[in-house]
Amino acid sequence: MGIKIIIAGFKGKMGQAAYKMVTEDPELELVGLLDPFTDEKEVAGVPVFNAKEELAGLEAHVWVDFTTPKVAYDNTRFALEQGFCPVVGTTGFTPEQLEELITLSREKQLGGLIAPNFALGAVLLMQFAAQAAKYFPNVEIIELHHDQKKDAPSGTAIKTAELISQVRPSKQQGAADEEESIAGARGAYFDGMRIHSVRLPGLVAHQEVIFGSQGEGLTLRHDSYDRASFMTGVNLAIKEVVKRSELVYGLEHLL
């Protein structure tokens, strides 16, 4: 029997990519689609729902969520309460919300994943950045995304900064007396480092982590040119979370 999947936010670009991936994998079975704004009642024989409450009692194993930060927390909590293992690519969770969801997953003995990025290359970039920061503590992050992305900085950039801050002491970068002639010119502040967000049409998801030291520099970069790049990670996550009994934050915990 295949793993039964619900996709929330299936009308969005990531949701459409997830739909294609799930329907093309013989080990997965799509049993429900959720989108509050569609008039469709079914797609290729799969029922479509407008409200998550309509999915209560549906026989499913995994809830794949590519919605919006505004509803992702409530969706993930609902999924766990219904016995679905959540695989969530929506960003914008607070540390308190993550802790609440992890606690709930332990109570329910359900695996799950919230990941700022499902591209394996992006996960490796974050790991490489954490390694480099031990030797190059002066660092800035530039993340670049399409102009319809709602949150800034990206979840990937924040996760990268968190990993870096775990391996280097907090430090002030730049001149001690620097001044911004235009507010925000130096980017967002995170534990001594700066994060810069770019939003332009034509982009998908890109990130640079730039390290500087005496007489040398190191730049790490990852590019997602197509949303298909995320689906390898989503597929892996779906097949892994059903074996687990706790929600984790970051795809690296499933690799």
UniProtKB/Swiss-Prot annotation:
It is found in: Cytoplasm. The active site is at H145 (proton donor/acceptor), K149 (proton donor). NAD(+) binds at G9, F10, K11, G12, K13, M14, G89, T90, T91, A115, P116, N117, F118. PROSITE patterns: DAPB. Keywords: Amino-acid biosynthesis, Cytoplasm, Diaminopimelate biosynthesis, Lysine biosynthesis, NAD, NADP, Oxidoreductase. Belongs to the DapB family. This is 4-hydroxy-tetrahydrodipicolinate reductase. It comes from Streptococcus gordonii (strain Challis / ATCC 35105 / BCRC 15272 / CH1 / DL1 / V288). The gene is dapB.
